[in-house]
Structures are given as structure tokens and as C-alpha cells.
Amino acid sequence: MAMAIAMLPALFSSPSILTSRIRCGATANSGGAISSTSSNSDPRRGVPLYKPKSYEVLATDAANSLAFALQDSKSRLEIDFPPLPSSISSYKGSSDDFIDANIQLAVTVVRKLQEKIETRACIVFPDKPEKRRASQRFKAAFDSVDGISIGSLDDIPGTSVTNFFRSIRSTLDFDFEDENEGTWEPKEPPTLYIFINCSTRELSFIEKFVETFASSTPALLFNLELDTLRADLGLLGFPPKDLHYRFLSQFIPVFYIRTREYSKTVAVAPFVLNYNGALFRQYPGPWQVMLKQTDGSFACVAESPTRFTLGETKEELLQVLGLQEEKGSSLEFLRRGYKSATWWEEDVELEASSNWRN
């Protein structure tokens, strides 16, 4: 965790355009709070400004939002925020760095959540080798939290064919028993299952795990970057799009930060304008479009009770910056293209639930 906390400033400090045209339901003040942990703020209102000072604060905000959702009897939940600074992308950085950061953050969120409500959390890994690796590397972290247990998607009862391939994998990976193997087995039924570090192919196994073990128990998808994984659904070798319609659509984002970098060409110097923004949500507050300021903070420019599409997020940022083309013009069409939303944002009528939009 020390590595992640030490590197936090890079996540919220890259250059951006500062604008005075901030329009939002909440009003920012010059000396206002820079995170939502203040006890004086109404959680149902959006934050005017967001800039957590550390990953500890970020985890606290995530745990607070999760606690509100659990108290409202929400059982299918999502938390998604950058586990490492934006200067380290998932392509440039080591995958182990992201895996380890997510484990540390998940444990921290559980610890913070237990300060709010009684929780017996089970962290579910993609497979037994990942579970075993975590038990070896994070033994002290798991021991520091009461009632925490760990499991894997391999715990799902399999067919004879599935069991055969699991035995092959175990042999090839030298998947031998470890002395810590049974240390964090659940002694009582968990009250919350947390799924971390899973890929697109493993989403269908999460669905089976939930059906088998968590049909009436809250389940949390933690930092899976679902928008990235959804893009693979329907492609050859991946689960079908129906997985989103029937399963992923049930998960309500309770704490969500998706940062993006944009650029806009203009006819005058400097000819290219760069700006950064984020789609932001803290349950039970509204969805918010945030514009990055020169001091690294994110200021609210628009909010809605329902989720903004990625295209709408960009349009809100362009509008507040005064860079939006004239509506209906040919230039607007050429810049936006024929479609400005993804298939999972468009196919409302096929969804079993609208929770993921709320």
C-alpha cells in the first residue's frame, strides 16, 4: 500500500485547462473540502470538488459509499477507480503491480467498511494459483482484518470435463498445496463476496459463482474495469453480449471514477487543446461529469440521476469549455461520427436491469 499511496499525486496532477464556467448542482467554494469524507456533507448531493489526498482517503470514500448501498439493501455492487496513478497505464506498467494494488485496496476497503457495519468479507480470486499467490504475499494484510476470508472461482462445482482441465492446469503449473491454504477459509457464511483481478473470460464464471454461493448475498465487482471488459463481449473466444444484458446490468456502481484524456483541434494557436475529465459517482449521490483543474482537482460541471454515456461525458466537457460545435452542423457530425455511444450504452431494451445506469 505504501507504494500506491506514495504515488497518488500523479493520479490527480497532470496539466489541464482551468475554466470558470463550472455549472453543477453543488456549488464549489474557494476553501472547500477536496474529498467527500466530511461528515457535514449530504451524501445524496454531488461533490463540487474532488481531490483525495491519499489512497487511504480514496478507500475511505469507497467504503462509505459501499456502506450506504448495503444499508439500502443493494446486493449487486461495483467499485471502480484507478488502482495506480494514471502515469502508469495498464500497458506500460507491470500487471503484477495492478494485481497487488487491487488486493491491498480491497483489504483496506473491507477494513474501512467494518468500521461502519459488521462485515464478513470473502475476497474471490480468478483461480487457485492467484489465491495461493495472494495468501503468500499478503498474509499480514489478511491477518490484520477480522472475519476476512479468501476463495477462488475454482470453488465452483465443475463438470467432469471442467475438473479434468483443472487437473491438467494444476499439474502443469505445479499447483501444489501450501501451508497457508486453509488459513482464511470462511468460518461463517460471508456477508459480502468481493471479486477482483478477473478478465473478460472469467465474467461468466463470476455469474456461476454468484448463482451457486451468493444468490442472496451481496456481491461486489472490485476494480474490474467493466467498461473495458464489456468491449470484448461478443468477440470470438469471449462470452456473448447477453452476459451484460442478463448479469452485469444488475450491478450498481457505488463508487466510480473513470478518468480520460481528450484533445481538440482548433483553427488558431496552439491548434490542439488538451483537457482531462472524469465520470464520477459516489452512492447515493448523482452521476457527475468532472473537469480536471490546473491544481489537479476535479470540479463538477454537470450531474444527472442516471449515468452519462462516454459520448455525453465528452460533450458536457466540450460545452463547459466553449469548444462544442454548432448543433446540427456538418462539422459536428464529422467530429462525432455516426455513433457516439457503445452497444451496451444503447441497448436499453435488452437489459434485465437498469441498475448499472442508476
From Swiss-Prot:
The modification N-acetylglycine is found at residue 25. Its main location: plastid. It holds the Pfam family DUF1995. Keywords: Acetylation, Chloroplast, Plastid, Transit peptide. GO terms for cellular component: chloroplast; chloroplast stroma; mitochondrion. It is found in: Plastid, Chloroplast. Residues 1-24 form a transit peptide. InterPro entries: DUF1995, LPA3. It comes from the Eukaryota. This is Protein LPA3. It comes from Arabidopsis thaliana. The gene is LPA3.
